[in-house]
Structures are given as structure tokens and as C-alpha cells.
């Protein structure tokens, strides 16, 4: 059985342009969740988040595989060129694994955020507030308007 092709939804706002895979759920905190199988989710930062953070300098995890996690828990941290941030859990369940490829090639974080630059996987239930790509585009437009100092919806 082959996977259906992923449609990348283009979005352009101000000077920021991105493509968003339509096979994922997105959170207001700029994480994506990809359902890999029954209850197993891969988590990563959106391209918007990686651009705001800059190049990955260092990262770490505060939980081990098999640990119970809850929505909003801090599971790790990312230090990037422009900022440092905690990694929050966009779901509830069991932490499965971290992406060890980032240890050997940290450029994957911002060069391939929807592919090989994923952060970790978990088993459980995703954030009930996560949206489809259209909902995330609306959130992203609002965030960019705030950064640009414009009321939402102005061009």
C-alpha cells in the first residue's frame, strides 16, 4: 500500500512565504503533528518556527522514551541562533523517541523541518485544539500581522 501524495499548501504573507504539508495537524505554538500509525505521532516545528529561531545550535530532551507526557509538558529545549525555547508536548500519552539525526546533522532542523528535521514521536492523543492546514494558515497570518504591526486582515 502506498501513501497518498502530500499536497503542499502555499501561503504568502508580507515577506514571508512557506509551503505547508496538508497531511498534518498544526498547533498555535507552531508545531506540526503527523499521524504515523494508530496513535503514533511525529512532532516537528513548522518552517515559520524554524525561521524565527534560526539555525539550531544545541538541543536536549528532559524525558526518556517510555515516559508519560501530558499536553503542554516541557519535553526538551532548543537553543538556536536567534532564540532559545522549550519543546512542549502537543498531546498526551507516552514519549517514544527523539530524532537522533539532529545530533549528527543539526542543519536538518531548518533545512527540512517537515521531513528529516522532525523533533520526536509520541503515542497517544493529539492536542484537541490542533487544526488542519487551513486553520493554521489563518493563525499564521494573524501572527505575521502582529509581527508586522498590522491589524489582522490588512494588506
Question: Locations of the language-model features?
Answer:
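Non-catalytic terminal segments and appended small domains
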Residues: 1-74, 85, 97-155
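Conserved catalytic-core motifs of eukaryotic protein kinase domains, centered on the activation segment
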Residues: 81
Amino acid at each position: 500500500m502506498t501513501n497518498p501524495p502530500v499536497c503542499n499548501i502555499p501561503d504568502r504573507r508580507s515577506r514571508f512565504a512557506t509551503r505547508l504539508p496538508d497531511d498534518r495537524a498544526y498547533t498555535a505554538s507552531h508545531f506540526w503533528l503527523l499521524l504515523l500509525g494508530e496513535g503514533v505521532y511525529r512532532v516537528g516545528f513548522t518552517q515559520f518556527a524554524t525561521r524565527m529561531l534560526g539555525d539550531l545550535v544545541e538541543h536536549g530532551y528532559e524525558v526518556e522514551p517510555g515516559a508519560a507526557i501530558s499536553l503542554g509538558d516541557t519535553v526538551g529545549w532548543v537553543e538556536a541562533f536567534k532564540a532559545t525555547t522549550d519543546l512542549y508536548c502537543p498531546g498526551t500519552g507516552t514519549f517514544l523517541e527523539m530524532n537522533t539525526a539532529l545530533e549528527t546533522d543539526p542543519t536538518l532542523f531548518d533545512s527540512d523541518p517537515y521531513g528529516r528535521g522532525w523533533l520526536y514521536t509520541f503515542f497517544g492523543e493529539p492536542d484537541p485544539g490542533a487544526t488542519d492546514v487551513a486553520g493554521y494558515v489563518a493563525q499564521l497570518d494573524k501572527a505575521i500581522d502582529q509581527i508586522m504591526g498590522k491589524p489582522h486582515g490588512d494588506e
